[in-house]
Amino acid sequence: MIMNYNVIDKIDVFDIIRHIKDPEFPKTLEELKVVNEDWITVIDNNDINDSDDINNNNNENYKGYCFIKILFQPTVPHCHLAPTIALCIREKIKEYLPKRSKIEIYIKKGTHQTEDEINKQINDKERIIAALENPEIFQLVKKCIKEDDY
């Protein structure tokens, strides 16, 4: 379900991901305090003025792009489903946003025992594709991001 956004902001992104169900607990990521609006950064090309410079490149290179950075906090420091939660967040955003987006997802600093290793994994395109090719992981992600009536 692609939404029609003129300019995307962190409130829009939070509204998209807040109702994702946790893969282990019968609650949403918002209810478990895994995601928070304040942990989201969005730079939408429609919101860039002439003095802004993303990644020290010319803004024209980014016409039509939206940059989204999301931090999340697993429920426990040894959460084995942190990569799955990141996949759910990424797939939910991709399902809703109409424009090309660069999405970066990270575990909030100091909240997981292997956060550096997992952060590399959850932002590696090849690993993301490989994970979603696994039928069990794919079905779990689809189940977690499925819309319910709220």
Swiss-Prot record:
Lineage top rank: taxon: Eukaryota
Keyword Ribonucleoprotein: no
Cited InterPro entries: FSCA_dom_sf, MIP18
UniProt record similarity statement: Belongs to the MIP18 family.
Protein name: MIP18 family protein FAM96A
Organism: Dictyostelium discoideum (Social amoeba)
Annotated keywords: Chromosome partition
GO biological process: chromosome segregation; protein maturation
